[in-house]
């Protein structure tokens, strides 16, 4: 290592330490400008103190940046050390940072809580040394506010209504609140940054619009509240809601019971009618057949039958399967004449 370069770095470190000690004990008169940034975003810190550094190759420029968590901190963290005569790359660079040699600036990648603090910069240009500091403050961005009615009081005598509104956010650091009406008039004093607003309205001014603005040093978001949805005239209806509930709930139970009971009776009647329906019987047909005797018979038998009809009637019952179509109401009788052959 070059002895001259090593000596220069030692001198620069000594001056930087002396500056930090002087600043920490309050002996310095240097004021650190404050840089406000959003948490999680990248931030560029210029390492020049309001004048352009001559980066000629004939001149030597050395930069040392350290970071302290508090003004009186005795142990500072080394962030970057850079020697222009050795090239465009720094000798040391802490993780989470990016050094830009063209404009001599330091980029903080994705601001984190541990990135917040005092950045002390020492710049050596030939025989002159500059020392200055920058304070970085990080704030979480404010989320959209929510407005709720905490309390509502109805004055029946004079028809006025008193409301207590609350404006809150879920995210955000050092959040302050301000209230205004539709015309933009601030309803609270500048010193009062409360998230609560107490208003009293008459019947003629119940349809109003109010704005709540939640803000911090890096963000500001407003939310509009329409009072017509929370009008005081709805107080009477809200008071009558308990007895309406006590009346409507039993009535609904009775109606449901009647509907279920009616459905059960109808189902039973339908099942009974299907059960009592007579089955389809097979249709019976009766066939009458006559058998006639011919030829000589024994005399005795012939004499016994002379007074009778020479034909003998035979009854035969025939069964026919029932058709699938509509059954006929009356049976059909078929008569057939059968003649016996001569013996």
Swiss-Prot record:
Recorded topology in the membrane = Single-pass type I membrane protein
Question: What gene name does this entry carry?
Answer: Slamf1
A cellular-component GO term for this protein = cell surface
What residue ranges lie in the Cytoplasmic compartment? 266-343
Originating organism: Mus musculus (Mouse)
The record places domain Ig-like C2-type at 145-228
Q: Where are the transmembrane segments?
A: 243-265
This protein is called Signaling lymphocytic activation molecule
- Write out the PTM section of this UniProt entry: Phosphorylated on tyrosine residues by FYN.
List residues of the Ig-like V-type domain: 29-138
- Residue positions, PTM Phosphotyrosine: 288, 315, 335
């Amino acid at each position: 290592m070059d002895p001259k370069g090593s000596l220069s770095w030692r001198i620069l470190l000594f001056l930087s330490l002396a500056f930090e000690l002087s600043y920490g004990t309050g002996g310095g008169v240097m004021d650190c400008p404050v840089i406000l940034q959003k948490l999680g975003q990248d931030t560029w810190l210029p390492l020049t103190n309001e004048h352009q550094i001559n980066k000629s190759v004939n001149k030597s420029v050395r930069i040392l940046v350290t970071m302290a968590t508090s003004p009186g901190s005795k142990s500072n963290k080394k962030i970057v050390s850079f020697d222009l005569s050795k090239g465009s790359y720094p000798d040391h660079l802490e993780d989470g940072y990016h050094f830009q040699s063209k404009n001599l600036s330091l980029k903080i990648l994705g601001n984190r809580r541990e990135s917040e603090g005092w950045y002390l910069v020492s710049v050596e240009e030939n025989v002159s040394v500059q020392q200055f500091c920058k304070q970085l403050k990080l704030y979480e961005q404010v989320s959209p506010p929510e407005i709720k009615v905490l309390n509502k009081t109805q004055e029946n005598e004079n028809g006025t209504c008193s409301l207590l509104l609350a404006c809150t956010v879920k995210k955000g650091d050092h959040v302050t609140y301000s209230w205004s009406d539709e015309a933009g008039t601030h309803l609270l004093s500048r010193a009062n940054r409360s998230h609560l607003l107490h208003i009293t309205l008459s019947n003629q001014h119940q349809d109003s619009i109010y704005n709540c603005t939640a803000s911090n040093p890096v963000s500001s978001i407003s939310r509009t509240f329409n009072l017509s949805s929370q009008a005081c005239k709805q107080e009477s209806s809200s008071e009558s809601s308990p007895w309406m509930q006590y009346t409507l709930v039993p009535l609904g139970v009775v109606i449901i019971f009647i509907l279920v009971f009616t459905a059960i009776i109808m189902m039973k009647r339908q099942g009974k009618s299907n059960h009592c329906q007579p089955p389809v019987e097979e249709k019976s047909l009766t066939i009458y057949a006559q058998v006639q005797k011919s030829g000589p018979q024994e005399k005795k038998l012939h004499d016994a039958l002379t007074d009778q009809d020479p034909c003998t009637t035979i009854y035969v019952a025939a069964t026919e399967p029932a058709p699938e179509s509509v059954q006929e109401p009356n049976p059909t009788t078929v008569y057939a004449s059968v003649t016996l052959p001569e013996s």
